[in-house]
A protein has these predicted regions:
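Active-site-proximal helix-loop-helix substrate-binding element of RNase H-like nuclease domains
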Residues: 5-14, 18-21, 80-116
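Acidic, Mg2+-coordinating catalytic module of metal-dependent nucleases/exonucleases
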Residues: 43-49, 54-58, 93-157
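Substrate-recognition/cap helix-loop segment adjacent to the acidic, metal-dependent catalytic center
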Residues: 53-72
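A short, structured active-site edge motif that brings together acidic residues
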Residues: 1, 70-81
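Short secondary-structure boundary/hinge segments and terminal tails
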Residues: 29, 115-117, 200
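Conserved non-catalytic scaffold segment of RNase H-like nuclease domains
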Residues: 1-56, 213-219
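Short aromatic/hydrophobic-glycine micro-motifs
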Residues: 16, 64, 103, 187-188, ...
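Acidic two-metal-ion nuclease catalytic site recognized across multiple nuclease folds
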Residues: 125-220
Length: 220
């Protein structure tokens, strides 16, 4: 419906060409039926942090974004695997995780159903407490009003998703955005190093909690 061909580099990964898709279900029908199948209560589990955003981008293109209100909470199994078996920051390929966990490779990779099955197999190897404590939030659809803002507490940090601001200056004048609380005791921390820019999109600061020590703040 949008592209008349598949780029060679994509073809090498997914081993499909445009002819394979000609008899497929059109996206508006596919996403509508998929969300109906999901029902009222569902949670997305993905491998990586791009799938939920790309899904919403496609839905927006077809004027169907109202079917999936955001921001969308989901669980990134790639991140959960790193927290469980690596350093928490490194992100590995799905096949690498399958090899490390000695899960049988009975299907090919880079196909939707097969990768979903492998992701579920990795998920089975992760402690439920780690899963529950580390939700991800896709903000392709940002909060529009103060009442819609989101606060999430993780074991080692807090996340605050604010409403949209018209300018950078307004962001940095907002007290709640620029304040810092300790992620352990949740009390206000004393600023040690004022907010500074690391690049045009990110600000950092250093604050101190008398009981729990130094805290790095980040605004992006």
């Amino acid at each position: 419906q949008v592209y008349n061909w598949i780029h060679d580099s994509i073809h090498e990964v997914i081993h499909m060409n445009y002819k394979d898709l000609q008899n497929g279900t059109l996206f508006p029908q596919a996403i509508t039926e998929f969300l109906e199948w999901c029902g009222e209560e569902y949670i997305f589990f993905t491998w990586g942090n791009q799938d939920v955003m790309e899904l919403q981008r496609n839905m927006k293109f077809y004027n169907l974004l109202e079917l999936l209100p955001g921001p969308v909470t989901y669980y990134d199994v790639q991140k959960l695997y790193s927290i469980s078996y690596d350093d928490g920051t490194h992100r590995c390929a799905l096949e690498h995780a399958i090899d490390e966990l000695k899960i049988e490779k009975s299907k090919g990779f880079h196909r939707a159903l097969a990768d979903a099955w492998y992701t579920a197999e990795v998920l089975k190897k992760i402690n439920n407490i780690i899963i529950i404590n580390h939700p991800s939030l896709d903000v392709y659809q940002n909060p529009k009003k103060k009442k819609d803002e989101i606060h999430i507490s993780y074991p080692d940090h807090d996340k605050y998703v604010s409403r949209e601001f018209a300018t950078r200056e307004r962001i940095m004048k907002d007290r709640e955005v620029t304040s810092t609380r300790c992620p352990v005791c949740h009390l206000p921390a004393k600023r040690k190093l004022r907010w500074f820019m690391n690049n045009p999109k990110v600000y950092y600061s250093i604050s101190n909690c008398e009981e729990h020590g130094l805290i790095r703040g980040k605004i992006r």
